[in-house]
A protein has these predicted regions:
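Long amphipathic alpha-helical coiled-coil/heptad-repeat bundle
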Residues: 2-230
């Protein structure tokens, strides 16, 4: 779903900066979290051992640990992830040092992503999967046009189907389009079913001063992803 100027202009603000980082940003592990996310199963260990260089091994382990935490892939700066690399070297490659680890080429990075998807039973969200997301967002919007509700339904579907989530901007456009389409659908049905005088009264009610009309007092965005708020 490529973004156009029209899409950008009607793109809804769904999550705060902190929420976006929590869901889609690179993990920032504590030492305890490193112990958990960089733990390797026998199959994972064998896969890491098959890498030809220390650079390839460390990057594969990094991305595997990050994917376990976020189900996302990241392009990393070595200096930015130095604490994670030091943990991996100390734990799995005693005697090796940070200066031995270089950057990966893009083809190798993409090849490692495919390896991780196979190891963990995930798939990229492409083609038919994205069409299914569009349909799901449209159905969800028929239940509620609150953007956070629709986004949560989409993210739950991706998790249940073990699909790598598209980027946040894509999901933002997806939800925004679903809300716009649902508003148009409901408006069209109302225009077809209601006399002109009732249409005018309804329009006035929905756009009146919030301080006067309870219907607008009750209309608000959910504060978070809890069931109570949604």
């Amino acid at each position: 779903m490529p973004s156009t100027k029209t899409q950008v202009s009607r793109r809804l603000t769904i999550l705060s900066t902190e929420e976006i980082d929590s869901l889609f940003g690179m993990p920032h592990f504590t030492e305890g979290e490193r112990q958990i996310h960089f733990e390797l199963s026998p199959v994972e260990q064998a896969t890491i051992n098959s890498a030809r260089t220390i650079t390839a091994s460390v990057h594969l382990m990094l991305q595997l640990g990050y994917f376990k935490a976020k189900a996302q892939f990241f392009v990393v700066s070595l200096e930015h992830v130095r604490p994670d690399i030091n943990h991996i070297l100390t734990r799995y490659y005693p005697g090796r040092v940070m200066s031995e680890v270089g950057q990966l080429s893009k083809p190798t990075r993409l090849a490692q992503q495919r390896i991780i998807l196979d190891l963990l039973g995930y798939r990229q969200c492409n083609g038919d999967e994205k069409q299914a997301l569009i349909s799901l967002a449209q159905r969800s919007a028929m239940l509620s046009t609150q953007p956070k509700f629709i986004l949560r339904e989409v993210l739950e579907h991706l998790s249940n189907q073990r699909l790598v989530a598209p980027g946040y901007i894509y999901l933002q456009d997806l939800v925004s389009q679903a809300v716009t389409d649902e508003h148009k659908r409901v408006t069209s049905k109302l225009n077809a079913a209601l006399p002109a005088n009732l249409q005018l009264s309804l329009h006035t009610l929905l756009h009146a001063d919030d301080k006067i009309h309870l219907i607008n007092v009750l209309k608000h965005e959910a504060n978070d992803f809890s069931n109570k708020e949604l």
